[in-house]
Amino acid sequence: MRPLFLLFALVLTHAAHAGGVERLKAFIAGAKTAEADFTQTVADRNNRVTQEASGKMAFARPGKFRWDYRAPYEQVIVGDGAKLWLYDADLDQVTVKPLGEVIAGTPAALLAGDDAIEKYFSLKNAGESGGLEWLEATPKSRDTSFERIRMGFKGDVLVQMELFDTFGQRTTLKLSNFARNPRIAPSRFVFTPPKGADVIGE
């Protein structure tokens, strides 16, 4: 299956002069749901773009999320609170895993997990660059493919994330048309494998 990245969008609504860490903690304490459009770019260690994608995401804390990749391939990622479902429409293949085994140390835990954020990450303010206020999160678990995650805020909004993995790749996520605490139907976080799809892991 092609690489899929568990990324999340959010809006923060606290003081503009707060650092990135304070903004993230305030969001986790107050936001229950979010949805947004996204564009995603993956670059290798030589800064060569190897993958571009776009789509729409939504989450409901704790532990429920959905990422719909619309281009260049149709792919779906769903966390239903207990299991993680990865569906590749082109391959007609579904991969399912227990959510707890894969969420720690990923952006899913950082943004859609529970309130114990510093159980999984070391957080620090990373200063201002490119007109954004940055936060850096380093996973405490060694059993993760991410070395660090940077989150860039403009005013009260998270507009960009950068994920650095153990293979030297950088994934950049840019957000638009986001909504904070929208009403989201519970059925959006339920995934039923399409009839005839190859299901791996269940």
From Swiss-Prot:
Keywords: Chaperone, Periplasm, Protein transport, Signal, Transport. The gene is lolA. Participates in the translocation of lipoproteins from the inner membrane to the outer membrane. Only forms a complex with a lipoprotein if the residue after the N-terminal Cys is not an aspartate (The Asp acts as a targeting signal to indicate that the lipoprotein should stay in the inner membrane). The keyword Repeat does not apply. Its main location: periplasm. It comes from the Bacteria. Belongs to the LolA family. It is found in: Periplasm. PANTHER family: OUTER-MEMBRANE LIPOPROTEIN CARRIER PROTEIN. HAMAP family: LolA (MF_00240). Residues 1-18 form the signal peptide. The keyword Translocase does not apply. Monomer. Pfam families: LolA. GO terms for cellular component: periplasmic space. GO terms for biological process: lipoprotein localization to outer membrane; lipoprotein transport. This is Outer-membrane lipoprotein carrier protein.
